[in-house]
Regions:
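Charge-dense, helix-prone N-terminal extensions
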Residues: 372-529
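Structured catalytic-domain cores with a bias toward divalent-metal coordination
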Residues: 1-374
Length: 529
């Protein structure tokens, strides 16, 4: 792909990369490649659409802490369920690997920039206030607990739509806002003696402020449509505040990449029609762009098709359809080079491009298609003479192979040249963690020569090198954890940017299968009747 920075007129301090939907892994996988490439060019931090306070745990892992395991970093270090995305696992591991042995000035930092809330509700501020008090050595837990009262008052999702049920403007909530403000002052007063750990404590205090602000907004007596826009706007304002604070903290180390949904990063206001009424609000990107000017750049994400989400190919007359014409590989395109086109039909699964989004963007990342197991199977079946067997009870296959796909050339079914699997075999083949939702693996018969060219050692030496590989990492050609001895390699969830390499390796594996079939045919022809 074209280098991202080459498309920008001015090198930004905050580079935003958007996705039009949550759920298409290809955007996260390309984000990972982009960030690691930017790290080589001086970027030192990444901020994701995830709870900023929770992100402190993920960053502990990234910094090499032995107190935070990878599992904990993923379960507690992300909000919105994003820790379950396989690409986010890879991001944390790659950042930790980069940081190993590097000085502070070159280390990568992980940030969340969302507030600890969802659009439909927010928690109580208690844990954030208590953690701030503990850092300061203050005991205000009794006072805070009395004001919090029943946690159910804060977690009532109906309060988002019924202001009379919200606790946000009660006397207790008002007093808690005063306490949060007092704790912020105490943090600054005590900064000289508590410099170590101060930034994390500040994040905890600001998280308390954020949820209290959101609860107050939920208590405003507004009509339903205005209410939604107000709450969405408050959330984006909190995101913008976090981004500006993150940039202030990171300014001396290098630029920051921020990754989120397009609607949070675009320069123009967000709009929505609810019950026939148009509502709008300034997103985080609109706020930050107005304050940072050309120090902020935004690349919006564009999606052609997504097998995983059930989104088909776009019409040729749409923005996405026209972007498909130049290449079926992911690419960055200057926004100014994209001609006018039709807006794709609205689909609740993702946000299509429109002229306003393009006009306010610096560039577009277009992904023509995501990749799933069925799409790869079709690619393999398009090769000459290929047949597929999917094991099941009807054809007498063993239970452990049910649902896998085996690809052969000719009638010999003893050795497939490629397989696609989506589940572990406990005790034998579980290093790829294929039991994660949506995860699959492509396995290919590379042969000894290609195997050695890729990995630097012959198949017979695999066990000596096993510990060098992370078999669960996406987008990486590795020896097959179970069949490397026979020259097999594998790739977990290859993204669309790897399709050319997949085609190259498929050609090798398919060619080997064709040769075997032709040799067998010649031997059969030489046999006497």
């Amino acid at each position: 792909m074209t280098s991202l920075l080459d498309l920008l007129a001015v090198p930004p301090a905050l580079l935003a990369l958007g996705e039009p939907t949550h759920g298409e892994s290809a955007f996260l996988q390309i984000r990972n490649e982009t960030f690691m490439s930017l790290a080589v060019q001086g970027y030192r931090s990444i901020a994701l659409e995830s709870d900023r306070a929770a992100g402190l745990i993920a960053n502990e892992f990234v910094q090499g802490s032995t107190a935070v395991t990878l599992d904990r970093a993923l379960t507690e270090g992300f909000s919105h369920g994003f820790g379950g995305a396989p690409a986010n696992r890879d991001l944390l591991l790659r950042m930790r690997e980069w940081n190993a042995g590097r000085p502070a000035s070159e280390r990568l930092t992980f940030h969340g920039f969302d507030a600890p809330l969802e659009i439909e509700g927010a928690p109580s501020p208690r844990p954030y206030l208590i953690r701030t008090c503990e850092f300061l050595g203050l005991d205000r837990s009794t006072e805070i607990d009395d004001l919090i009262g029943d946690e159910a008052r804060w977690s009532d999702t109906a309060a988002i739509w019924e202001p009379g049920r919200s606790i946000g403007r009660s006397a207790d909530a008002q007093r808690l806002r005063v306490i949060a403000d007092e704790l912020l002052i105490e943090l600054y007063l005590n900064a000289p003696r508590l410099a170590e750990g101060w930034p994390a404590a500040f994040v905890q205090a600001m998280s308390a402020v954020a949820v209290l602000r959101y609860h107050a907004a939920a208590a405003a007596p507004l009509e339903r449509e205005e209410r939604f826009a107000r709450l969405a706007g408050v959330r984006d304002a909190l995101m913008a505040e976090n981004l500006l604070q993150i940039r202030s903290a990171e300014a001396h180390r290098g630029p920051t990449l921020v990754f989120a949904h397009n609607t949070h990063l675009q320069r123009q206001s967000s709009t929505m029609t609810m019950a026939g009424k148009d509502v709008s609000w300034a997103g985080a990107g609109a706020i930050v762009a107005s304050l940072l000017n050309d120090r902020y750049a935004v690349i919006v994400g564009s999606l052609g098709a997504s097998p995983a989400l059930g989104i088909g190919a776009p019409a040729r007359s749409t923005y996405e359809g026209r972007l498909q014409r130049g290449s079926m590989l992911p690419r960055y395109v200057r926004a100014a080079e994209i001609p006018a086109a039709e807006r794709r039909t609205h689909d609740h699964r993702y946000f299509p491009l429109d002229q306003a989004t393009i006009d306010h963007a610096d560039a577009v990342l277009h992904i023509p298609t995501g990749v799933d197991a069925a799409m790869l199977a079709d690619r393999i079946l398009a090769l000459p003479g290929v047949e597929q067997i999917v094991p099941n009870e009807e054809n007498g296959s063993p239970e452990g192979a049910s649902g896998d796909r085996f690809f052969y050339v000719g009638p010999d079914r003893r050795q497939p040249f490629a397989t696609i699997v989506d589940h572990d075999v406990p005790g034998f083949d579980d290093a790829s963690q294929l039991d994660r939702p949506g995860v699959f693996r492509l396995n290919l018969d590379l042969g000894r020569a290609e195997f050695e060219r890729l990995f630097g050692f012959p198949p017979k030496a695999f066990e000596e090198h096993r510990q060098e590989f992370d078999f669960a990492r996406l987008d990486t050609v590795v020896p097959h954890p179970g069949y490397a001895l026979y020259g097999f390699g594998s790739i977990v969830m290859p993204g669309p940017h790897l399709l050319p390499e997949i085609d190259r390796l498929l050609a090798i594996a398919h060619g080997r299968a064709v040769d075997r079939h032709e040799r067998a045919a010649r031997r059969a022809a030489d046999q006497p009747d």
